């Protein structure tokens, strides 16, 4: 156990966060996301919500300030988004600094970004469109 680091962060995730460089991207996915078929390293965080993990890692993780650091999947045509999902994520990400805007991209563009991500963290999140990409910035 490490002091001041949330026990919600699995050791493998802590290692990945430390190994990431500026500009690297990580996905925090809902439980339904096809992470294992997309290619990058997969970390399991079953039983945890995305917002709980975001709240745990944001004190350790600098968001990119040169490019949009937050990306979520847009709803498929004819479907709807639950605005409370983004609101929960924004609240969690606002603990250290004001939360930057969240960019929405279509499902297949999100999958392409996920294939190139440093890692994908599968959570127990059950919210539809509950996936979020974080781009790492330079630590001041």
Curated annotation (Swiss-Prot):
Homodecamer. This is L-fucose mutarotase. Substrate binds at residues 30, 107, 129-131. NCBIfam families: PRK15420.1. Pathway: Carbohydrate metabolism; L-fucose metabolism. The lineage of its organism: Bacteria, Pseudomonadati, Pseudomonadota, Gammaproteobacteria, Enterobacterales. Belongs to the RbsD / FucU family. FucU mutarotase subfamily. GO terms for molecular function: fucose binding; L-fucose mutarotase activity. Its EC number is 5.1.3.29. Involved in the anomeric conversion of L-fucose. The keyword Isomerase applies.
């Amino acid at each position: 156990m490490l002091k001041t680091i949330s026990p919600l962060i699995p050791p493998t995730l802590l290692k990945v966060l430390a190994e990431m460089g500026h500009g690297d991207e990580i996905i925090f996915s809902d439980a339904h996301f096809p992470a294992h078929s997309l290619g990058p390293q997969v970390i399991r965080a079953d039983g945890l919500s995305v917002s709980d993990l975001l709240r745990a890692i944001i004190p350790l993780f600098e968001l990119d300030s040169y490019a949009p650091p937050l990306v979520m999947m847009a709803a498929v045509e004819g479907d709807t988004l639950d605005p409370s999902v983004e609101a929960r994520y924004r609240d969690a990400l606002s603990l250290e600094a004001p939360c930057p805007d969240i960019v929405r991209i279509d499902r297949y563009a999100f999958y392409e970004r996920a294939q190139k991500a440093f890692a994908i963290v599968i959570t127990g999140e059950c919210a539809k469109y509950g996936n979020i990409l974080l781009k790492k910035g330079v630590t001041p």
